[in-house]
From Swiss-Prot:
PANTHER family recorded: 30S/40S RIBOSOMAL PROTEIN S3, SMALL RIBOSOMAL SUBUNIT PROTEIN US3C
Compartments (UniProt record): Plastid, Chloroplast
Lineage: superkingdom: Eukaryota
Assembly description: Part of the 30S ribosomal subunit.
Originating organism: Oryza sativa subsp. japonica (Rice)
GO BP terms: translation
Protein name as annotated: Small ribosomal subunit protein uS3c
Gene3D superfamilies membership: 3.30.300.20, Ribosomal protein S3, C-terminal domain (3.30.1140.32)
Keyword tags: Chloroplast, Plastid, Ribonucleoprotein, Ribosomal protein, RNA-binding, rRNA-binding
Taxonomic placement: Eukaryota, Viridiplantae, Streptophyta, Embryophyta, Tracheophyta
GO annotations of cellular component type: chloroplast; cytosolic small ribosomal subunit; plastid
Family recorded in the similarity comment: Belongs to the universal ribosomal protein uS3 family.
A GO term for molecular function: rRNA binding
InterPro entries according to UniProt: KH_dom-like_a/b, KH_sf_prok-type, Ribosomal_S3_C_sf, Ribosomal_uS3_bac-typ, Ribosomal_uS3_C, Ribosomal_uS3_CS
Coiled coil: none
Amino acid sequence: MGQKINPLGFRLGTTQNHHSFWFAQPKNYSEGLQEDKKIRNCIKNYIQKNRKKGSNRKIEADSSFEVITHNKKMDSGSSSEVITHIEIQKEIDTIHVIIHIGFPNLLKKKGAIEELEKDLQKEVNSVNQRLNIGIEKVKEPYRQPNILAEYIAFQLKNRVSFRKAMKKAIELTKKTDIKGVKVKIAGRLAGKEIARAECIKKGRLPLQTIRAKIDYCCYPIRTIYGVLGVKIWIFVDEE
């Protein structure tokens, strides 16, 4: 039988890079991993907390990032602060944190970085290490599976048909130069009693080719009918 494997871990070291760069003695290695997890969770919690505060006011975002409910267009800028990944580089006295984000409107606000640094400093074990936070905007947001998954989640929570949400997400990828995309949603779709999976694929998706650069994400969506699982594969290019 064929065995499924995570496309990112399968290509780590070839087309995928590590998101943490540091060295530690074997006895301190677990502490470093826990510190990285705390830093990433702290940043994600900060984004989520402040995103809820500003959900009632309009935030400038890409005009195509919208949800259609009851024949009205609803701006979804409040749900567009999606982090694609966080890089952590550790030196002797400095921790460099680079946040790769799709639409960094929230973090551009005055005092946002300083407030985030204070929260992160509490999570860092050593008081002698200083934090250096950098923000890097993703050039093509709809090329990232995390942003597409967040887009689908936002539409499903607003009672949009899951098929329409999947098709719209694939349409957004037409603006990029990707070679293939696959979207899969599993769970109690449309509130049905029996769970099932629906999948839409466009273009090529060579999962068994190691030199093929494939981005992937698995995203849970909590709805009134239960938890839905969204998986997105994007075939970027072949090296």
